[in-house]
A protein has these predicted regions:
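Activation segment signature within eukaryotic-like protein kinase domains
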Residues: 160-161
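Intrinsically disordered, low-complexity regulatory segments that flank or precede the catalytic domain
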Residues: 1-48
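Conserved short submotifs of the Hanks-type protein kinase catalytic core
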Residues: 127-141, 145
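Glycine-rich ATP phosphate-binding loop
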Residues: 64-89
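Eukaryotic Ser/Thr kinase distal regulatory-tail detector
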Residues: 283, 324-373
Length: 373
């Protein structure tokens, strides 16, 4: 027992140490740097009992994200807080999300250390649940700020779009990963107002292959996804076009209360712009080039890839190295009162009692498929 406790304490020290003098590494050094080597690896000796659950940050169909701190921290680590994503095995199985959950953990493990992607520090499991320990982004969702502001000015939209471009460049060109769920709800702000992309449940390694799964959020789906033609990383550039439109107007270009009607609009209607608010010609052009029905002509997916995106007039004057190294000041600085402040997140009801148990029969059938945790 003492040996297990010592091992758990060592794992705690390792992942806490990562944040003490975190530095931004060039993209080609992220995976090679010894400092990032252990990030995302499974921790066999960690338990949910090693953490104090402070409050819920978000919920999903089969997951709940908690704000947590170490249960027995060293004095210098008392202010350290994290986000703990808890996935109930029985719900993951019922909703046929086993592959998606494994993809999420695997992809996050490989991209840990990127300045604009949530950091998977470690993962672990117990009989009933899977756990992913992530860095805490205290600013909350970009979605919330957009709703309060009604819309963003062009400089704000450009700031967030530029950071997303660097995310997609890294995922697509270095990792061969399609993210497939770009939307304001999946963009969090850190304490300095920079983006962190979260929720990689639909992310998938494609390389140069196509995939045919219908997944994502209706308003942001590319036409080839809806038409089951097979899709690639090009779907993320389409979604970025939709996102920039929403940043500038306050709403997506395709909308209806019935998702089927949204799909019909996406595959048949070009993006149109309102008379008000005024949108610059450069912004309109980049949106149109991202939201091109034929992906072979879609900006980001054509020859030159992300480099062509960076050269677009919408990003004129942007120094991309300064974007990557976070030298630009965030346009929205989240209000924070103390370390671990969660005022920028909604309140959520407690978990319901009487959840369906993860039986020994289910464990015998499925536990091998969760061995990555």
């Amino acid at each position: 027992m003492a040996e297990t406790t010592t091992a758990a304490a060592e794992e705690e020290r390792n992942f806490v140490a990562h944040f003490k003098d975190q530095q931004i590494l060039p993209p080609d050094e992220i995976q090679q740097n010894p400092r990032n080597e252990g990030l995302g690896a499974s921790s066999r000796n960690l338990s949910v009992r090693d953490f104090e659950l402070v409050r819920t940050l978000g919920t999903g169909t089969f997951a709940r994200v908690w704000l947590v701190r170490l249960a027995n921290p060293a004095e210098e680590d008392r202010d350290k807080v994290f986000a703990l994503k808890v996935l109930r095995k029985v719900e993951v199985i019922k909703l046929k999300q086993v592959d998606h959950v494994n993809h999420e953990r695997s992809v996050l493990s490989d991209v840990a250390g990127h300045p604009f992607i949530t950091t998977l520090i470690t993962s672990f499991s117990d009989h009933d649940s899977l756990y992913m320990l992530l860095d805490y982004c205290p600013g909350g969702e970009v979605f919330s700020y957009l709703r309060k502001a009604k819309r963003f000015d062009e400089n704000t939209a450009r700031f967030y779009a530029a950071e997303i471009v660097l995310i997609l460049e890294f995922l697509h060109e270095r990792e061969g990963v399609a993210y497939r769920d770009m939307k304001p709800e999946n963009l969090l702000l850190d304490a300095e107002g920079h983006i962190k992309l979260v929720d990689f449940g639909f992310a998938k390694r494609l390389g140069n292959r196509e995939t045919y799964t219908l997944c994502g959020t209706p308003e942001y789906l590319a036409p080839e996804v809806i038409q089951s033609k097979g899709h690639t990383t090009a779907v993320d550039w389409w979604a970025l076009g939709i996102l920039i439109y929403e940043f500038l107007t306050g709403y997506p270009p395709f909308w209806h209360s019935n998702p089927i009607e949204i799909y019909k609009q996406i595959v048949s209607k070009p993006v149109s712009f309102p008379a008000e608010p005024a949108i610059s010609p450069a912004a309109k052009d980049i949106i149109r080039q991202f939201c091109t029905l034929d992906r072979s002509h879609r900006l980001g997916n054509i020859s030159g890839g992300a480099a062509r995106v960076k050269d677009h007039p919408f990003f004129q004057g942007v120094i991309w190295e300064d974007v990557y190294y976070r030298k630009y000041r965030g346009p929205i600085i989240p209000p924070l009162r103390y370390p671990g402040d969660a005022q920028n997140f909604d309140l959520y009801p407690d978990e319901k009692e009487g959840r369906e148990p993860y039986t020994e029969e289910l464990a015998a059938k499925y536990d091998d498929r969760f061995k990555g945790f």
